[in-house]
Amino acid sequence: MKSSIALLAVLLLANVALAADYPRVIFSDDFSSNAFGPRWGHYKSGSVVKDGMLIGITPEKSDHPAVDNIKFEGERDLEVSVKFRFVSDKAKNFNVWFDDKDYKGSHAGHICQASITPTNVNLSDAKTGGFDLTGGLYDRKKENKLTAEEKAMLATKAKAFPVKLALQDWHTLVVQTKGDELTVSIDGQPVGSFKSPGIGHDHKSLVSLTTNQIDVNYDDFSIKGVAKP
């Protein structure tokens, strides 16, 4: 019993410490207004706000997952927190994307992401990985024309971690960028972290929830930054 209490105390202290690293609220939305606020942007999205939550919906026959995003002044170190649930087995996955639309060296200004499925969390560096436009890498990847060396390089730009998330259950996801490291926790428990140069991009200015395809619900979304001098 004492060891369990001690472990709980350590976890609570760790969570408090992590929260203290990102004390400044950049944006938050609890979706209580039953409508998207004016700061929300969208791309090929059929998502709606209803019953106090964001219901992620990719329109039928769309060629791109639904994107619902928030823009802000660019920063390097950020924390995104969101409650989510996979409603049915139609919910394939969702992504938390960090982008810089002013950056022209990667497709769509993609910098890094955390991709969540019911069984897997994948962390990736898009800036220097699969979305890198340098030398035509992104186009060759789309056309399935990568060399063996390029495939090996791209394999170093992502890292996967197993999870087990039951359908219908609500969970709290926290994604943090700190320097060149991307870290994820779910329900207060660490899932994994990944270091790669592109993650350290110092002007992340857009965060997106990308739903593939439907039946992902979101609530209590926030973006936080580190304290400013």
Feature-to-residue mapping (PLM):
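Short tryptophan-centered beta-strand motifs in secreted/extracellular beta-sheet-rich domains
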Residues: 31, 80-82, 169-184
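Beta-strand-rich interaction surfaces with strong enrichment in secreted/lumenal proteins
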Residues: 66-72, 159-165, 207-208
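Ligand-recognition surfaces built from glycine- and aromatic
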Residues: 199-229
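Short, aromatic/His-centered strand-loop micro-motif at the edge of beta-sheets
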Residues: 134-172
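Short carbohydrate-recognition loop motifs
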Residues: 46-64
